[in-house]
A protein has these predicted regions:
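Helix-turn-helix DNA-binding module
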Residues: 74-88
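Short amphipathic alpha helix immediately N-terminal
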Residues: 59-75
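N-terminal interaction/assembly modules
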Residues: 1-58
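Alpha-helical interaction segments
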Residues: 11-15, 70, 79-82
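Short, conserved sequence motifs enriched in acidic/basic residues, glycine, and aromatics
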Residues: 58-59, 84
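DNA major-groove recognition helices of helix-turn-helix
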Residues: 90-105
Length: 107
């Protein structure tokens, strides 16, 4: 998979915003799924969730999946990676994972 890491801070900001939107959409759907007049809005949010999950599960390699699934889908924050990766390896792999994730979402 080809990836570009020209601007790591922009990639990090975009992925963080996607993670926040993903968490919001999941909560929104759970909260309002029983209200019938909200069904179009819920379906739209479900499509966005499916896109994020589909990219994560289907298009990312194992290393990218590990980081994106933990930070975007599970919403882990802080030093969650310390039991798995060294800090320098994590930051290097995270930059690559973010770039690949954003690239896949653009497709």
């Amino acid at each position: 998979m080809i990836y570009r890491v020209e601007n790591k801070s922009v990639n990090q900001k975009l992925v963080n915003e996607i993670a926040e939107a993903y968490a919001y959409f999941k909560q929104y759907i759970e909260r309002y799924k029983l209200v019938s007049n909200m069904s179009d809005d819920i379906n739209n949010k479900k499509k966005k969730i499916n896109t994020i999950e589909g990219v994560t599960y289907d298009l990312l390699d194992e290393d990218d999946f590990f980081i994106i699934s933990n930070e975007v889908l599970k919403g882990k924050k802080g030093n969650w990676y310390l039991g798995y990766l060294s800090t320098s390896t994590y930051y290097r792999q995270r930059a690559k994972a973010y770039a690949n994730f954003l690239s896949c979402l653009e497709r």
